[in-house]
Amino acid sequence: MDRNSCLNYFQAFPFWEHMTEEDRNFLLDNIRELHYPAGAAIQSEERQCLGTLFLLKGVLRVYLLSAQGKEATLYRLRDSDICTLSASCMLSAITFDVQIDAETDCDLLLLPAVPFSRLMKNNIYLENFIYKRTTEHFSDVIAGIERTFFMTLTQRIAAFLLDEAADTGSDELALTQEAIARSIGSAREAVSRSLKK
């Protein structure tokens, strides 16, 4: 993406009009364009606190990983969404690390953590925008927690499949039992048994 395309992209955000010319140029000078193929780990235990990810195209999965290797999906991001938890080390209220994988081929822009931190300190509008986006995603996290604690496995699978159909706009889904299990925080064998009922 060339500089003019980046400029057009960022002008759509409400914080842009409140940035100084110096900060705008600083943002554009530090933005990096990235591409990840489906299945790639974008942020993991080895690679934490990348910065803020602006998803141009694709689907990202944001999840927690236990010491035992169990995964719990927090939420998914789709075209034109922003991943703020990829910069969790710069957000003082966030005290946990997340994993981020590309579920499909993804094109995104990265504002690395250090430039992101400087811009957040300089601009209350950007800071407010980032915290607002973060809190919006927490409604998805709470919904996931509610499902885990208050729904049966069969209900969780059904809710997940309905959400996926709504998100993709299709009644046909191509998912493995392993992918369903990872997404709902269960074991593949348990999902398999439940689907056979």
Question: Where are these predicted regions, by residue range?
Answer:
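Cyclic nucleotide-binding regulatory module and flanking cytosolic helices
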Residues: 1-37, 82, 87-91
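His/acidic/aromatic-lined binding-pocket segments of jelly-roll/cupin-type domains
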Residues: 33-34, 43, 50-56, 73-75, ...
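Glycine- and acidic-residue-biased ligand/ion/polar-headgroup-sensing regions
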Residues: 39, 50-63, 78-80
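Short phosphate-coordinating micro-motif centered on Lys-Gly-acidic
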Residues: 42-47, 89
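Cyclic-nucleotide recognition modules
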Residues: 73-132
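Short, Lys/Arg-enriched, Trp-marked, Pro/Gly-tolerant hinge/linker segments that flank
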Residues: 141-153, 169
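Phosphate-/nucleic-acid-contacting segments
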Residues: 153, 162-197
